[in-house]
Amino acid sequence: MAYSKILFCFMIGFVGFLPAITMATQYLVGDDRGWTLDFDYQTWAKNKTFKVGDTLAPPPSEGLTSGYDVITLTKPGKKWYICGVPTHCSDYNQKLVITVEDGAPAPAPASPAPQTEYWVGDDKGWTIDVDYQAWAKGKTFKVGDTLVFKYTKGHHNVFKVNQTGFQNCIAPPPSEGLTSGHDVITLAAPGKKWYICGFPTHCSEHKQKLAITVEGAPAQTPPVWAPAPAPGTPKKIDTGNSYKITSPYKMFVGGAVSIWTILTLV
C-alpha cells in the first residue's frame, strides 16, 4: 500500500514538470551512418527544417572529440561543419552545411486602419443649392477614406480641380469628368482637395462644389507576439527528439512537492 502511495506521488511530481517542457528536435547527423567518410551529408540535410533550439548530434566542431558531440542551434543563419582529420573533408566529403531558421513565430500582420465612406451631401446627394461646406464641417477625412458622389446621371458630373478652378468654377476638359451618377473617389494622399460640378451655372450660381482637407492615414495597430523562449540544455534520447527545459524553477518546485508528499505518507 505504501509503495502505491509513493508511486502515485511520483506521478504527481512528474506531471508538475510537464508545463516546463517544450519539444525541440535532435538530429542525429547521418542517421545510422553517423559522422563518417564517404557520405553525402547535403543529401541527408535536404528537406530538413532546422530551427533555433534544435540540436545536432554528433556534428563536428572545434574542440569536440567525444564521439557523441551535441551542438545546440542557438542562432538562425548558415552553419558549416567539417571533420578536421587530414583528407576527411577534402577527399571524402566529410562536411555539412545547413540553414537554421528562426524559431520565433512570425508576427501577425498589422490590423488595417479602419476606413470611412462618406456620401457627399448624405441623403441629398450631389446636387444644386446644397451647402457642402456646412456638410463637410466637423468631419475628419483621412487617407484611405472614400467620397461617394450620388446624383442623377446626365444631370450632374464631378470634376476634381485646383484651388483656382474651385474659386472661379473653371471645369477641366469634359474627358476628365466623372459621369456615372455613382462616382467613388478614394482619398489617396493628404492635403486640400477641391471638387465641382461642370454643368453651366451649377458651380457658380448654385454652389455645387466641395472643398475638404485630407489628413494622413491613422497609425496601424502594431502586431503583438510573445518572444521566443531562450534555448535550454537538451536531454539526449534515442528517438531523435529531445526535450528542452525552459524553467529550472518549475522543476525545483515540482520535485520539492513530490519529496514532501512522499515523506508525509511514508
Swiss-Prot record:
Domain spans labelled Phytocyanin: 25-56, 57-102, 116-216
Upper lineage: Eukaryota, Viridiplantae, Streptophyta, Embryophyta, Tracheophyta
Residues spanning the signal sequence: 1-24
Organism for this UniProt entry: Petunia hybrida
Regions that span the bilayer: 245-265
Gene3D superfamilies tied to this protein: Cupredoxins - blue copper proteins
Record's bilayer topology term: Single-pass type I membrane protein
Glycan attachment positions: 47, 162
Protein name as annotated: Blue copper protein
Induction context: Accumulates in roots, in a RAM1-dependent manner, during colonization by arbuscular mycorrhizal (AM) fungi (e.g. Rhizophagus irregularis); the expression level correlates tightly with AM development.
